[in-house]
Amino acid sequence: KAHADRFRINKEQIGVMGESAGGYLTCMAALDNDPALDVGEYLEESSKVQAACPWYPPTDLSAFPCESAEKCASSAESLLLGFNSMLNKEKAYQSSPVSKVTKDAPPFLIIHGNCDQVVPYVQSETLYGLLEKKRL
């Protein structure tokens, strides 16, 4: 946003998008507005975005199916988090986009195929339901 004039963009109309783990980051960028996360340069600029388009995002890292704690330790969601999500479900939930949804969330366009073999379709349905509920 600090370079908006240079790139001729409107810094008040910033959207983010990403696929899979990038979809997770898209959701977190759009939903987690904790000021403690604002570090580095350009702190005078807001990190808030005005739109999000996640593609097949993991949205509740505590809800992924795992057969055992041993198998879950090497799962994509545990590797993303840096800890075994099955052994610490509350921490996994708090690290998930679904725990960050508020009435102030920007507009979302969620794209997800219902035959996805990696990220269950219900992950997007859950986020969509929470976004709709908070907007009412």
Model-predicted regions and their roles:
Residues 1-136:
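Alpha/beta-hydrolase superfamily serine-hydrolase fold, recognizing
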